[in-house]
Amino acid sequence: MVAGVTRTFKGKIVGKDLTKWGKDAQLDFSAELAKAKASGAEGIFVFYPGKAGGAFIKQYAQAGLQGKIPLYSVFTVDSIALPKLQKANMSGVMGSVMTQFWAPDLDTPQNKKFVSGFKRKYGRYPSFYAAQSYDTIFLIKSAVEAVKGDLSNMDGMRAAMKTANFPSVRGKFSYGNNHFPIQNFYSRKVIKDSEGVWTTSVQEVVL
């Protein structure tokens, strides 16, 4: 993740720290946050899934950086982490930004149906993992229907799946010649919804 940012970021990177992972993972980020504060940086990017993410967000707020140096992350803040962060009242996450190919507030008929049904059944917002799974079922369904239920027609199944002729929660979706998805990526910001639940909202298309 860090290598990707380093390779593609158009601005100037004024500092980089790699912290310890594993059973004895580093959870004290005071030194790194102090360096970031002193560097004059206009943003902080992190990749901290799990408990390290919560620890970093808490210390980021305690260091007085919230509202001063924007926080950007990947696989750190999402619909899986946000309920836990809200329960722990880690408000330092509010206003932070991440990118993803899907968001719960994407304005498509299929996504509205998916999100409302998921919330009704589980009482929370779906994650992008759930969105992927939902899309996958409809993709497979489209292929099965294309071969009229003849699952032995593997070539027909593959050809049908390649067309991606299904209603995606992501909106416009197709495959390239290498079978990688062609899809939008969105900048998403952590907000409170109308009921006070922490979630993310699309800001703009970034890719």
Where are these regions (language model features)?
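Extracellular/periplasmic periplasmic-binding protein-like sensory domains
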Residues: 57-134, 145-151, 190-194, 198-207
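Short, amphipathic alpha-helical "lid/cap" segments that border enzyme active or binding sites
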Residues: 29-33, 130-137, 141
